[in-house]
Amino acid sequence: MDVTAKYELIGLMAYPIRHSLSPEMQNKALEKAGLSFTYMAFEVDNDSFPGAIEGLKALKMRGTGVSMPNKQLACEYVDELTPAAKLVGAINTIVNDDGYLRGYNTDGTGHIRAIKESGFDIKGKTMVLLGAGGASTAIGAQGAIEGLKEIKLFNRRDEFFDKALAFAQRVNENTDCVVTVTDLADQQAFAEALASADILTNGTKVGMKPLENESLVNDISLLHPGLLVTECVYNPHMTKLLQQAQQAGCKTIDGYGMLLWQGAEQFTLWTGKDFPLEYVKQVMGFGA
């Protein structure tokens, strides 16, 4: 790819960032589509995020992806949020229209799309959701919008717990889905929730390097063959949770599904063009 002065810049703002597959995936898609954009990763944490957004405007970047730890903070720096993004309280995509910034969240739509593409119908189902960060709440919000009956959210009593309670209140007030929040330390409640669940989704970074030998499921007997286990982590591809799930006879969906579908939606938001899905799946080895 020969980058010329006509190219527009799209970024990804996160910390850490060197593990991300998004730059490779998006640049392959942009080149295949013959578009004059290039996608670059920038190490940006909460402290440097405000300045990075000013830089985005000054450089007239087309937009940026937003990942940990900036997804919730980013809501404060855009001019407009989609209804789904308001429900989530976090964004992963910013589109810059001549200095007017719009915030979107494609994490939720991407993950739910991956579930649907596997042939699983979420309507009327119960999900156990691990974590209350930007990705997790995005999945919960989109699942609620698309027909989940109940979401049982488990999170440690950390800085995200109050945010989880606020998220549950927003979803309960604006959708027909019932969301409850429980401390993950309550292992009896966790076991009971899994016993009656249809879906278990890990929306935390547990399982991602350097935590690749960890899982929030301490007892594999809690997993049953009727359970669909889905993962947001894609590095490593086969997390400990997915290994446990397969050993228990569960159907699984790895983190590549969410990465692919959320990225496809981002691509269209930035470029107005269709994402070359099958080509990207092939060259990135997704689903292989």
Curated annotation (Swiss-Prot):
NAD(+) binds at residues 132-135, 155-158, 205, 232-235, 255. It catalyses: L-quinate + NAD(+) = 3-dehydroquinate + NADH + H(+); L-quinate + NADP(+) = 3-dehydroquinate + NADPH + H(+); shikimate + NADP(+) = 3-dehydroshikimate + NADPH + H(+); shikimate + NAD(+) = 3-dehydroshikimate + NADH + H(+). The keyword NAD applies. InterPro entries: Aminoacid_DH-like_N_sf (IPR046346), NAD(P)-bd_dom_sf (IPR036291), Quinate/Shikimate_DH (IPR022872), SDH_C (IPR041121), Shikimate_DH-bd_N (IPR013708), Shikimate_DH_fam (IPR022893). It holds the Pfam family Shikimate_dh_N. Pathway: Metabolic intermediate biosynthesis; chorismate biosynthesis; chorismate from D-erythrose 4-phosphate and phosphoenolpyruvate: step 4/7. GO terms for molecular function: quinate 3-dehydrogenase (NAD+) activity; quinate 3-dehydrogenase (NADP+) activity; shikimate 3-dehydrogenase (NAD+) activity; shikimate 3-dehydrogenase (NADP+) activity. It comes from the Bacteria. Keywords: Amino-acid biosynthesis, Aromatic amino acid biosynthesis, NAD, NADP, Oxidoreductase. Its EC number is 1.1.1.282. Substrate binds at residues 71, 107. Belongs to the shikimate dehydrogenase family. The actual biological function of YdiB remains unclear, nor is it known whether 3-dehydroshikimate or quinate represents the natural substrate. Catalyzes the reversible NAD-dependent reduction of both 3-dehydroshikimate (DHSA) and 3-dehydroquinate to yield shikimate (SA) and quinate, respectively. It can use both NAD or NADP for catalysis, however it has higher catalytic efficiency with NAD. HAMAP family: Shikimate_DH_AroE, Shikimate_DH_YdiB. Homodimer. This is Quinate/shikimate dehydrogenase.
